[in-house]
A protein has these predicted regions:
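P-loop NTPase catalytic phosphate-binding loop
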Residues: 1-62, 67-145, 154-156, 220-371
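Phosphate/diphosphate-binding loops
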Residues: 141, 147-163, 168
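Conserved SF2 helicase motif VI
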Residues: 146-152, 379-384
Length: 395
């Protein structure tokens, strides 16, 4: 069952060979498109899974997965068009060699498929692959590469599926069976898995961040963590959350990157959480206006006789000028006082990090890269994220 055996399918030429197999309950990852970013995530996930299994094995002092009382599922990684991987992502081939060399004792097995094996599989990888299968080929050298002789070139084209298997001890002839109705097979396997109560297996990796993310209402409106988008760790996506009761939050980035949209999203979700009073302020032609929100709508909360909630969240857009130490107007003084008030969390947007001179001004920074390498690095954006698309940020 899926709790004992998992599959990862990787097709690096965008074919549809594995697309139907994605529905198998055993499948924990699949790449069937031409998106190299998706492929890189899959390879990173396999490395992370190998490391995780090494740690599990070391924790119980087991040299082989078979020695573990509760071993992880055996994982079969099937790579179609292996030569395309080598051409497009050559730096990752050596990492696959590591999986091939260390994975067997940890329950990870690699099946690499290619139309032309000549020069595609390195000597290190061959040394860790105990079985070679060769179907009909046109060139005897291709057969020699896998079988040691040219017999696969002599197979008749009238016998599709005929092949030879070299298991390092002998070469055996066989014929592959054809699965004609993959959809029906997958449906029956999925039904059987549900019938016996096999638990669903978590995915090893997800697709990259989508271009657009729809705003969704927060399910529980918990004031501790407000969900506002998707976070990406390079392998998996998860819900991005931020605490509105743990200190001030600075949203940093140039105009047009998404700061105002983010503030509006956070303010709307916060206004639907219990125990928070939400105030929103923004300048218009150098005149500041403020309003209170409750349930996503404006409310005269500030003028009400009801006691205030235990915590206030103040959203301030375009707050650069409020950091000017020479300003003494009411808005600037209120802003400065709120930054130091533990009963108030200020979520402010500024165009650069320069106004934030005191670390206590914000415990959390959400930075939209501006495109200037030095400025982005100073703002805390990792070098690998400097080329992020507009609308994406680093927390």
């Amino acid at each position: 069952g899926p709790e004992h055996l998992n599959f990862v399918f990787l097709d690096f030429k965008g074919g549809s060979a594995f697309r139907k197999l994605e529905r198998l309950p055993h499948t924990v990852g699949s790449v069937c498109d031409l998106d190299l970013a998706h492929a890189v995530r899959a390879l990173r996930a396999l490395e992370a899974e190998l490391t995780r299994r090494e740690q599990l094995s070391a924790a119980v002092h087991a040299s082989d997965i078979r020695d573990m009382v509760n071993p992880p599922p055996r994982l079969i990684v099937v790579i179609d068009e292996f030569h395309a991987l080598k051409d497009q992502l050559p730096d990752y081939v050596n990492r696959l060699v590591r999986i091939a060399s260390l994975g067997r004792s940890l329950g990870m097995y690699l099946i690499a498929c290619t139309q032309n094996p000549m020069g595609q599989v390195s000597a290190d990888m061959k040394a860790n692959m105990s079985v070679s299968i060769c179907l009909r080929v046109r060139d005897r050298l291709q057969s020699c590469e896998l079988l040691g002789d040219g017999r696969a070139a002599d197979l008749s084209p009238a016998m599709p599926g005929a092949a030879f298997c070299n298991d390092s001890e002998q070469v055996t002839a066989f014929r592959c069976a054809t699965a004609r109705d993959i959809d029906a097979v997958c449906r029956q396997i999925a039904f059987a898995s549900r019938f016996v109560g096999s638990p669903p297996q978590p995915s090893l990796f997800t697709a990259p961040l989508p271009r657009h993310v729809k705003d969704r209402t927060v399910a529980d409106h918990a004031p501790q963590r407000i969900r506002f988008g998707l976070a990406d760790d390079g392998i998996n996506l998860r819900e991005a959350t931020v605490s509105l009761t743990g200190g001030n939050i600075g949203v940093i980035g140039p105009q047009g990157r998404g700061k105002t949209t983010l503030l509006k999203t956070l303010a709307r979700h916060a206004s639907m959480a219990d125990g928070l009073a939400v105030r929103v302020s923004s300048p218009h032609r150098r005149v500041w206006s403020s309003q209170w929100l409750h349930g996503g709508r404006c409310t005269p909360y500030a003028s009400s006789d009801a006691p205030p909630p235990p915590h206030i969240v103040w959203f301030v857009d375009d707050a650069d000028e409020l950091f000017d130490p020479f300003r003494t107007d009411e808005q600037a003084l209120s802003f400065t006082h709120a930054l130091a008030d533990e009963s108030v969390s200020v979520v402010f947007a500024v165009s650069t990090i320069r106004p934030i001179r005191i670390p206590e001004h914000c415990n959390t920074r959400i930075v939209f890269p501006c495109g200037e390498r030095t400025s982005d690095l100073m703002a805390g954006v990792p070098a690998r994220l400097l080329d992020m698309k507009i609308g994406r940020a680093h927390v």
